[in-house]
Design a protein with these regions (language model features):
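Active-site-flanking segments in enzyme catalytic domains
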Residues: 2-215
Length: 215
């Protein structure tokens, strides 16, 4: 493994050897962008690696801070991966305005939830029960649920979000955002990084909450 970047991101070169370099480079850069934005999450991203993921999964993030890129998808040419991802945005599966670079941005968004668990749960102690509580919060998307609830309230106070129900705010980001609150948070992060102030009102609100908590 090779340590790259000022935050100590480990790139598992052997596991990524069959993937297209530019696709991997873009993913690593996307993750570092998030780490730059959120100092409290810097020590929680431990590894970028490749693996054979189940059919249809482009990438994933684990509680242990590992982001895994699918060998099947990231071994494609840049244009090939672009076409695949653009097909998902055309269907509304992922936020409009995002591209293949935001695959890793989405996964880094999950690591931000892990940082919230560290801040609000694991910081209370290092005993077994505390560790179990942290893992349970990850499994149940407890912290992302709290972020989304607050962000929905904030979004409804804006002209763009006024009068919208929570479900409508979430669905406006993407259909994938409706899966669960962890995916809502990650999709909002990708939406904001891609579109900035022009992102959906919920995404703008989620970003503001995360910046307050972890920035």
């Amino acid at each position: 493994m090779k340590n790259v970047g000022q935050w100590g991101i480990y790139v598992n070169e052997r596991s990524l050897s069959g993937q297209t370099f530019e696709n991997v480079r873009e993913a690593a850069a996307a993750v570092e962008t998030i780490m730059n934005e959120f100092p409290q999450a810097q020590g929680l991203f431990h590894e970028l690696r490749g693996d054979d993921l189940r059919n249809g999964v482009i990438a994933n993030a684990s509680y242990s801070g590992v982001i895994t890129l699918s060998n099947s998808y990231f071994s494609r040419t840049e244009d090939g991966l672009n076409r695949t991802y653009d097909g998902t945005t055309a269907k509304g599966l992922h936020p409009a305005g995002t591209n293949k670079s935001h695959i890793a941005t989405h996964e880094a968004g999950h690591i931000l939830e892990r940082a919230l668990i560290d801040k609000h749960i694991l910081s209370k102690g290092n005993g077994l029960l505390t560790q179990l509580a942290g893992a349970d919060a990850w499994r149940k998307a407890t912290m992302s649920g709290k972020v989304i609830s607050e962000a929905c309230r904030l979004a409804k106070k804006t002209p763009a979000g006024k009068g919208m129900k929570n479900d409508a705010l979430i669905k406006s980001v993407s259909s994938y955002a409706t899966m669960n609150r962890a995916e809502t948070l990650a999709e909002c992060v990708a939406d904001y990084v891609a579109n900035g102030a022009n992102a959906k009102p919920l995404s703008v609100a989620v970003w503001s909450v995360l910046k307050r908590e972890l920035g």
